[in-house]
Amino acid sequence: VTRVLHVITGLEHGGAERQLALLLRHLPVSCEVATLTRAGALGAEIRRSGVPVHEIGMRGNRDLGALPRLARLIRRGRYDVVHTHLYRACVYGRIAARMAGTPRVIATEHSLGEGHIEGRATTRGVRALYRATERLGSATVAVSPAVAARLRAWGVRPGRIVMIPNGVDAAAFAFDPARRAATRRRLGIGLDEPVVGGLGRLVPTKRFDLLVDAVARMDGVRLLLVGAGPARDALARQARERGVSGRVVFAGATSDVAGALAAMDVLAAPSVQETFGLGVLEGLAAGLPVRYTACPALDRLPPGDAPDARRLPSDAGAWTAELARVLREPRDRTRVPPAVARYAVAERAAELARLYRPGPFAGGAEPIRERAQDAAT
């Protein structure tokens, strides 16, 4: 059985971290996880599922002692593959894996945006360090064509990039009225109150401020924000200034994303820049109407695959009008659009497992240049 060590920067409830936890349940290989920082609540969940989680104890970006500690773990484990996730883990993990003599090193690039990577500016130094360590790996997985294009712009050779999008477990998000009622009771939301939902890290680029403004212009509508991050205080202050602090619920990070989505009536994703748009797909899997500004996961799909997912500009007036309209319309939450099935997690896990095999793009995984040509024809 192929033995794989996944190396990730941390295990908070972010999109990349949740995606790893999901893949661990579907990958047909033996997996362990190493987190550079603390394991946290998500790490505890992964351990309860039977997957070992190792904490490297990294104390900051300048903690160079983390590198030999990680290399020792990899050497002792004698893994067939090291698979890294997120910038810091990709840099440290590739170096440590090569120090330990691991035969195959894969990296997934989840969060490479335009001008930033995981919230840090993509300075010349950041790009140079990434390129230098990327060459130590066997292949880099891009979760969307947008990420692949940015990797190429950074100087990563196209033949080293494989596109494998994120996966969704549709069954986990199937609408459950009892779960909706229980989540609303726990959050102090009335069963009949209309709820606009936002899902993701509370950072300025997510533009949740547009949702606060929109809710302030609508009577009796609640805003449920699911996630944590540095913009929370600014959003809470904005809600107070707009006189709607009593109608905005900050739920924080949660392991029960399905329950949070069940409690919503519409998912609003006004982020101006996304590398994939996992939350949008999860909202669709939950039977929600979804309004978004950026979602690479939907960009290349036929319009009929996600009929109730619509793009809106970054304008509070447009969001107010559209959300008010959507909330007036009845919905059948049991209907899930075809777009969700296109990203079935079992298929994504099978693609990764093929990539773990020895040899260039083993088992039929395609270099991004081939898929880009297919998309253009």
PLM features: what roles do these ranges have?
Residues 174-189, 335-336:
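A short helix/loop element that forms part of the nucleotide-sugar donor recognition site in Leloir-type
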Residues 64-68, 103-106, 113-136, 149:
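Nucleotide-sugar donor phosphate/pyrophosphate-binding loop at the beta->alpha transition
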Residues 253, 272:
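Aromatic "clamp/platform" in nucleotide-sugar-dependent glycosyltransferases that forms part
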Residues 35, 289-293:
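Short hydrophobic beta-strand element within catalytic cores of glycosyltransferases
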Residues 146, 167:
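Carbohydrate-associated surface elements
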Residues 301-317, 325-330:
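Conserved acidic donor-binding segment of nucleotide-sugar-dependent glycosyltransferases
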Residues 14-22, 194, 198-217, 221, ...:
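A conserved mid-protein helix/loop that constitutes part of the nucleotide-sugar donor-binding site
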Residues 6-65, 150, 230:
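N-terminal strand-loop element at the rim of the active site
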